[in-house]
Amino acid sequence: MAVSESQLKKMVSKYKYRDLTVRETVNVITLYKDLKPVLDSYVFNDGSSRELMNLTGTIPVPYRGNTYNIPICLWLLDTYPYNPPICFVKPTSSMTIKTGKHVDANGKIYLPYLHEWKHPQSDLLGLIQVMIVVFGDEPPVFSRPISASYPPYQATGPPNTSYMPGMPGGISPYPSGYPPNPSGYPGCPYPPGGPYPATTSSQYPSQPPVTTVGPSRDGTISEDTIRASLISAVSDKLRWRMKEEMDRAQAELNALKRTEEDLKKGHQKLEEMVTRLDQEVAEVDKNIELLKKKDEELSSALEKMENQSENNDIDEVIIPTAPLYKQILNLYAEENAIEDTIFYLGEALRRGVIDLDVFLKHVRLLSRKQFQLRALMQKARKTAGLSDLY
């Protein structure tokens, strides 16, 4: 039964980026029907636990012309997608984890895609596609061999010395204190049946056969054989644990190097900003000093002019730079004086101070003179290269 979007939102209701998580989950379960969202308790390495959603099921992986259903479990942290998911291979009872550079003995998956995870360039669909490619080159699980009893010893034939998949029959690759399937991570339920056929070697890639020490003449396994097998299993486990820690340390070192580079770049940018600010402060101080100096000069000039204002002729305050400009100024002043005179004559006529004949006589004379002044001023402005005023 497909999980609805409302059910997904309820599962990730405590997630910081709920909508992004739901959108990516819907895209994944739409494309990979065998992956199902499950809400479960995840136990961290420090012993703390948290309710998280995981995608558990199988993904199709092509290997040597056949397609195998590889069981995985993807735990989504509550800060997803800004933190990568925690990924595991989850073998069934008929499978065994094949440790390698991408999968440790606990089934945890290590990929460069996870170490370099960066939203929005990284997402669940891209992660699953990378897993399919990587697992197609190096399968993370192989089918567990069928246990076979040893035949009775015959004096005329050699003992049976070849077994699959590389361990003496009936001997676990772990000491008695370890379970066959380590459980350092939370369990994820898987659908039974079809996707994982029983134990035939054609359903999952098998490891090549190796030669081991055979049973003793009485049909039992000697203590030396058991001891050697246990030592080999423990050595392999320690070797892969050490490689896991080294890879993790290398990943942290690479992350620290990138952080150091970012800090150096940031430090350089800050130094450039400080230098630029110092230059701007120096320029502002220089402009302030210049403004103070000009203000003092203006204050001194104003004080000097105020002291001399009683002896100054108002007509001599404005002195044009050329005689032509002085002529234009005088013509303009005289023309405006005539304009004011005509205005006040009109006011006198309106109030009855003068009669109409006197008004018309003076207005006629003033208008004629005003016309002559305007014509002369237009000619002077044209000679001076100025625009027309009327």
Curated annotation (Swiss-Prot):
Tissue expression notes: Heart, brain, placenta, lung, liver, skeletal, kidney and pancreas.
Effect of residue 46 to A: Reduces interaction with ubiquitin
Record PTM: Monoubiquitinated at multiple sites by LRSAM1 and by MGRN1. Ubiquitination inactivates it, possibly by regulating its shuttling between an active membrane-bound protein and an inactive soluble form. Ubiquitination by MGRN1 requires the presence of UBE2D1.
Signal sequence segment: none
Effect of residue 45 to A: Reduces interaction with ubiquitin. No effect on MGRN1-binding
MF (Gene Ontology): calcium-dependent protein binding; DNA binding; protein homodimerization activity; protein-containing complex binding; transcription corepressor activity; ubiquitin binding; ubiquitin protein ligase binding; virion binding
Region (Disordered): 198-220
SMART domains: UBCc
PTM annotation (N-acetylalanine): residues: 2
Domain UEV: from-to ranges: 2-145
Coiled coil: 235-316
Nucleus recorded as keyword: yes
Entry remark concerning the domains of this protein: The UEV domain is required for the interaction of the complex with ubiquitin. It also mediates the interaction with PTAP/PSAP motifs of HIV-1 P6 protein and human spumaretrovirus Gag protein. The coiled coil domain may interact with stathmin.
Protein name according to UniProt: Tumor susceptibility gene 101 protein
UniProt source species: Homo sapiens (Human)
Gene: TSG101
